[in-house]
Amino acid sequence: MDRIRIVGGRTLEGTIKISGAKNAALPLMIASLLTSETLTLENVPALADVNMLLRILGHHGVDYSVNGRRAGEEPHASRAIHLTAGTIVDIMAPYDLVSKMRASFWVIAPLLARMGEARVSLPGGCAIGTRPVDLLLMVLEKLGAKIEIEAGYVHAKAPKGLHGAEITFPKVTVGGTHTALMAASLAQGHTLLVNAAREPEIVDLANCLTKMGAKIKGAGQSTVEIEGVGRLSGASHKVLPDRIEAGTYAIAVAMAGGDVLLEGAEADLLQTALDTIEQAGARISVTNEGIRVRRNGAGLQPVDVTTAPFPGFPTDLQAQFMALMTKAKGSSTITETIFENRFMHVQELARLGAHIRLEGDAAIVEGVETLQGAPVMATDLRASVSLVIAALAAQGETMVNRVYHLDRGFEHLEEKLGRCGAIIERISGTA
């Protein structure tokens, strides 16, 4: 099992090219099941989750090709993936595949919409709370599906097809909104979504579906309208830049100090996070090329943060920002409102010398003068990168174990940081 070794104390200088967004790429890939024609996605990041989803789609009969690295390309060069679901060969998504990645459960919507039936295992993935699929199933039931759950599988049927409906989400749900957009695009009639998620990745999916022939109005707003169509066609679409990756590297620069251009990053996708990082002491400017992040020797300031749906502070940057606050001059409170059990990184940050105490859904971080390198263990995707950020500013060597979590969501992280001066290396095959 790979590990990542980091020696702290180096500032970051240079350029980091921001990859395509994982959280956009996965539902876009799943949308290929909605049509028998070819969907081409550009700027797809090279990640373990992307590769796993390709396996799952292949199981259902999707033919795909991937333009990988070519000689002379940057190691983080984007990929184009061509997906053709000419014939769906299996409406069942088995446990051994779905259990490895929760987002793969979303195949239930296009399979049901196109084939009238789907049987999908209940999901796995990061161990962050329960992440119930109830809201996704509520969407399908509202659209006319009959749902049965038995032996760990969800069996959804709509033999006469789905029909439009008014769906009011009891709380904002990204997965539920993705599900509704895909299923309602092939449903008969009009669908109205109330309290829909507004995340940029939702807008990206809606834009792609529109290119495929869907009729969607209002994506990115809390009320969305979908007029169902009889069929969807192929299309080409470029995945939007990863706002979580951009925010992560912005926090890394704020932590380590230095001057880095986040090439291709779009500020309007993460403005709340950028404002918060700036309050903590970084200097941020938007250029034609991306986002420039700087911090000189000035100390970090404590900032209270509460996670919230877009356009609020992203839950997927909570762990990274907590790592930053471990070095702030004073006390900060970080409140998690999206997921339960998303403080698993606290114990590992404490191994580096962080002072953090938990009070319900809040973490109180008392900044310390010095962090000290130590062996630590990644527990999930975002927690793992928070340990890397802390290690950049720690004295001595930190060894991050279980980095397969990092590979699920960060493309060539050690190469990108290493090019900016970090002392970081991957050690392969070590238990």
Swiss-Prot record:
Subcellular location: Cytoplasm
Binding site for phosphoenolpyruvate: K22, N23
Pathway the protein contributes to: Cell wall biogenesis; peptidoglycan biosynthesis
Catalyzed reactions: phosphoenolpyruvate + UDP-N-acetyl-alpha-D-glucosamine = UDP-N-acetyl-3-O-(1-carboxyvinyl)-alpha-D-glucosamine + phosphate
GO cellular component: cytoplasm
Pfam families: EPSP_synthase
Disulfide bond residue pairs: none
Single GO biological process annotation from the record: regulation of cell shape
Active-site residues, Swiss-Prot/TrEMBL: C126
Keywords, comma-separated and alphabetical: Cell cycle, Cell division, Cell shape, Cell wall biogenesis/degradation, Cytoplasm, Peptidoglycan synthesis, Pyruvate, Transferase
A GO molecular function held by the record: UDP-N-acetylglucosamine 1-carboxyvinyltransferase activity
EC nos: 2.5.1.7
Organism superkingdom: Bacteria
Residues bound to UDP-N-acetyl-alpha-D-glucosamine: R102, R131, P132, V133, D134, L135, D316, I338
InterPro entries noted in UniProt: Enolpyruvate_Tfrase_dom (IPR001986), Enolpyruvate_Tfrase_sf (IPR036968), MurA_subfamily (IPR050068), RNA3'P_cycl/enolpyr_Trfase_a/b (IPR013792), UDP_GlcNAc_COvinyl_MurA (IPR005750)
Gene3D superfamilies, sorted: Enolpyruvate transferase domain (3.65.10.10)
PTM-bearing positions, type 2-(S-cysteinyl)pyruvic acid O-phosphothioketal: C126
Main function: Cell wall formation. Adds enolpyruvyl to UDP-N-acetylglucosamine.
UniProt xrefs under HAMAP family: MurA
Matches recorded under PANTHER family: UDP-N-ACETYLGLUCOSAMINE 1-CARBOXYVINYLTRANSFERASE
Sequence similarity: Belongs to the EPSP synthase family. MurA subfamily.
Protein name (record): UDP-N-acetylglucosamine 1-carboxyvinyltransferase
